[in-house]
Amino acid sequence: MTIKDWYKLTFLIESDSEEIIIWKLNELGIFSFSFEYLIKNKNKKEVNIWLPVADWSESSRFGVEKIITKLLNINAPTNQFFDWSIIKEEDWLTSWKKYWAPELVGNHFLILPCWINLNEKFKDKKIIKIDPGAAFGTGSHPSTYLCLEKMDNILFSDKKILDIGSGSGILSVAARLLGAKEVCAVDNDYLAINATKSNFQLNFGNLNNLNTYLGSFNEVILKNQLKQFDFVLCNILAEVIKEMIPNIYKCLRNNGEVIFSGILNSQKDEIIKILIQNDLKLLDVSTRKDWACISAQKASDPT
């Protein structure tokens, strides 16, 4: 295995800027990052971002600085705001783990990084064991919270589930824990498909009840004729969701439901409008900080 070096980018933000930073990093395809409270100043957080040296040229790193500076309206010189360092692969493989801890979501879920032992006080929870590796987080993004909270109140027993943009596979695992008989996971990143399989195996000891598809959702739907799902889970960016809604409608059973997350509050009205235009009935909207989760239903065909 080739040993890689990693850039570590560190800077400080106001605590209430965390969500917009997460959104922008996800949009840029950057998933290896953490946020830490400062002991001496609870209104500030330290952001740490890890980027593989081989993939990030000087101009690319400057581009990230420029985007973040504009996003946060920073006037200070970049060399005073951003701190870059290089860490070795072997240090990276252990150092990033210290930023993750077990997290309770909803009434029943506990997200448990696989290297942490389960505390006995949580043994009655539905445990989602996750090994995020270097590419994916452990589910701490507010949009993931919202989706899991919504799922926590739904009966998935014997249902057929489609997870669009599966990422680490956390929603696929949750659906199976809630009793889903079949989970289909779709992602256009082979790392995500591998992570979904790995985390499914980690939780259930096998890949039974899981089917994975590599490619964009619209392409996969047409090629594999995926349809007749009871529930669709879609935790991705709003701009991508808008393009998928017509095909999501087609792959739902009558009375099937879809849960959309990854939507900023400022975008939810537009998404709701498109849902209604595509004959999907709005069921519920929930919010967490700057993010929204929308659930909708495909009505039965008229008889």
From Swiss-Prot:
Gene3D superfamilies, per the entry: Vaccinia Virus protein VP39 (3.40.50.150)
Taxonomic lineage of the native organism: Bacteria, Bacillati, Cyanobacteriota, Cyanophyceae, Synechococcales
Protein localization: Cytoplasm
HAMAP family (alphabetical): Methyltr_PrmA (MF_00735)
One of the GO biological process terms: methylation
Binding, S-adenosyl-L-methionine: T144, G165, D187, N235
Gene Ontology annotations for the cellular component aspect, listed alphabetically: cytoplasm
EC number of this enzyme: 2.1.1.-
Family listed: Belongs to the methyltransferase superfamily. PrmA family.
Gene responsible for this protein: prmA
Top-level lineage group: Bacteria
Native species: Prochlorococcus marinus (strain AS9601)
Protein name according to UniProt: Ribosomal protein L11 methyltransferase
An MF annotation (GO) of this entry: protein-lysine N-methyltransferase activity
Coiled coil: none
Swiss-Prot/TrEMBL keywords: Cytoplasm, Methyltransferase, S-adenosyl-L-methionine, Transferase
